[in-house]
Amino acid sequence: MAELKKMRHNHYDVPVMDEPVIASQIKKTNQKKESFQLPQKKLNKISVFEKILCILLLCSIVGIVVITIQIRTTISETMNNITEAQVKNERKKEEMLKLEQEKSELSKADRIKSIGKKQGLSEIDGNLRKVK
């Protein structure tokens, strides 16, 4: 014959209810608890790891903002320096062209001959040299 299984008798602690609870009363009590909850109690619900993670996230965002601003200012300073260098370079080129033109005008053979004649010098072909 088959033996009967032993039944366990579990006793659950069930509170005795005097009056039935209405669902609207439960919602009101839940709302009251949340509305009177202090911010410090809300912060206590956040774990230490989450707090550290939030602080690190905020610090990294602030760091990225600061670094971005520094990079932008560095870029603008570099661009200004490049522009100044280009302007100086252009001025030097213009000055160089101007001086070369002046040199070529001053070193023309006709001009040298006319100045020599004014000074009372005579022209001897053997003593003339080309000016470069």
Swiss-Prot record:
GO terms for biological process: FtsZ-dependent cytokinesis. Residues 1-50 are cytoplasmic. Its main location: membrane. Keywords: Cell cycle, Cell division, Cell membrane, Membrane, Transmembrane, Transmembrane helix. It comes from Melissococcus plutonius (strain ATCC 35311 / DSM 29964 / CIP 104052 / LMG 20360 / NCIMB 702443). The chain crosses the membrane at residues 51-71. InterPro entries: Cell_div_FtsL (IPR011922). Residues 72-132 are extracellular. Belongs to the FtsL family. Essential cell division protein. It is found in: Cell membrane. GO terms for cellular component: cell division site; plasma membrane. This is Cell division protein FtsL. It is a single-pass type II membrane protein. The keyword Cell membrane applies. Signal peptide: none annotated.
